């Protein structure tokens, strides 16, 4: 049994769940006490801090810090999952200009309350929304 204490910053690859990453770290290190600081959707990539040993006690401190996200988007397509991985259910020509985008971007900066889409890792009654959506 390993007795490591600290934080590993893992660049979570696409198609791995946060739990998958924890399982790999557990298998590679033999560490029993592990945690992470917030679930990333399986199709999301990015830094996933993995806490080992006594560092798991700092989880709340890390979770309560500001986070930032970078997003890419495509205008003119609608999918059944509201993301790029779904089946395209509609298309339209986009007449939005770069200037129009630059004017509205400030509306998406700062603290924003968002209703998560059904295809997300958010849990309801102990189940991931993306699992419920696929049923």
Locate predicted features:
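Catalytic/RNA-binding core of pseudouridine synthases
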Residues: 1-135
């Amino acid at each position: 049994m390993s007795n490591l204490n600290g934080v590993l910053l893992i660049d979570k690859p696409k198609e791995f769940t946060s739990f998958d990453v924890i399982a790999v770290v557990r298998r590679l290190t033999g560490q029993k006490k592990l945690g992470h600081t917030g679930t990333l959707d399986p199709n999301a990539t990015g830094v996933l801090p993995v806490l080992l040993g006594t560092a798991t006690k700092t989880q709340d401190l890390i979770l309560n810090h500001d986070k930032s996200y970078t997003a890419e988007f495509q205008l003119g397509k609608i999918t059944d999952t509201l993301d790029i991985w779904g089946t395209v259910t509609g298309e339209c020509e986009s007449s939005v200009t770069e200037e129009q985008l630059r004017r509205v971007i400030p509306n998406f900066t700062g603290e924003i309350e968002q209703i998560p889409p059904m295809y997300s890792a958010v849990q309801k009654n102990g189940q991931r929304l993306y699992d419920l959506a696929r049923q």
